């Protein structure tokens, strides 16, 4: 009976808090229409009180759920401890399997410096802005075309495309 009464009181607190917030919002909108100071005072009292009641109802329902589930968790823990200690099953790796990931990384770390020293070839040159391969002989790339040249080439291509379209239509 006590559990049911607590549930009803919790639901009532949530409902009352929500209704008080809604009523306060209604009084604020009604007060701005009819210019009534009494409704504004009631609204500014109902809004914070409604929020406090609503939040207390939320926390109260959470507390009730935790205390109910705490009993279930205690029961499960007692059953688990009554069975005794858990045995953890492990699997040993046979020698014919490849090495573990961590072991393979250690082997690669040891072999990489030796390979670099043995080759003696420097890495290729790259540009500062990208990762394109840059030839050692061509140290100065050609300059981009001027604005007038690029516009002129665009106009020429547009005119040729337009002429092709007109030729296809006729």
From Swiss-Prot:
The chain crosses the membrane at residues 8-28, 40-60. GO terms for cellular component: membrane. Keywords: Membrane, Transmembrane, Transmembrane helix. It is found in: Membrane. InterPro entries: TMEM252. Its main location: membrane. Residues 112-147 are annotated as: Disordered. Disulfide bonds: none annotated. The keyword ATP-binding does not apply. It is a multi-pass membrane protein. Pfam families: TMEM252. This is Transmembrane protein 252. It comes from Pongo abelii (Sumatran orangutan). The gene is TMEM252.
